[in-house]
């Protein structure tokens, strides 16, 4: 059904499935793979999570409610991307910071960071106020369904994002270069790390989760640029002369930079991994890939050679009312000459280009699509060290099985039942009340089971791993 599209050949806007690419992903010619990658090649529907080289774990998408908050400066990843959020998590709100305006108004780098800090302080405080208000409303019974199924906003993030880092570098008097240049890239890395540090400060100050997001900014890129051009006629935007103004999303490259997907990935890989949520690389293609194998090969190459957490394969396609699906960009049907709809991805969703706002339309006109057939992957760019199975090697290793739990964790109860039914003895540790023991063994999730071995101890840090351990003991 997803491959056929609707009655007119349009791809379905929803659902937007997120597929996890792990080291154990089966790349063989199965029927499921043919369907998945044919859908990817034709409509670009799915998102892909990179669990091969990124710093994410497959269990992360389910583990937010069980994470232990022992280090208030730890910036956690908001897993699942835009469309696959983990259980019991989300954002209470998002504030997007206008980076080009800060750069334009700053005479030097020091003033830039001073202005950025001021805006981040205001953003963090406003998000704290919003969190307090909606939490009071939740407790007062105004969100009965949320209260029943979610219970609390404690695992929700206060999100701060940015827009237009490419144009910020162009407007910065001390740089005057775009993100294709090394100097601008290094400044961007410095800015993102600085923002991460400030977010850790806010976590300590307010006691809430904060994260740094590459916000989609579907309309914000146009709205902020439009207001800036009106107020500051000399400010540089991403638009060409005569076009509606817009800013480049987050720290993305100029949309017309290259048609080599791997050249773009080489630069974006280092930048996108500094965000803790919302970041995604869209591989914009001019048209449908030739077959499902081509799509599978590209998805695999990206996962195995880059660290970025989320990406899409995004071909452009057109739809004629009479003749249905047409590969590529055709504003008039090549068969009947009638006007047709051109579909491309706009910050996550496929929408007809004719319906985009003026700023995003300018972006589409400038966008250089990737030529996969002539893109060159630089071999050996990743140091592919196999991660060993996590094992503790503490001098004071436990003499008995230790199960770290939390009172409000449903998976902790499940783990106890599994161990009890199997007759496996253990000592239950309340991870929050016995924090010294928890810190001693570096436990960050609940439930976590520590099993002593000859050289140290094995770590099973979620209910799935504990269940697998129990099954192995039975065999």
Predicted regions and their residues:
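Conserved phosphate/anionic-ligand binding catalytic regions in large, soluble enzymes, centered on
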Residues: 88, 152-169, 338-355
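Short amphipathic alpha-helix with an adjacent loop that forms part of the alpha/beta core around
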Residues: 437-442, 470-473
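Local sequence-structure signature of Cys/Sec-based thiol-disulfide redox active-site neighborhoods
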Residues: 390-424
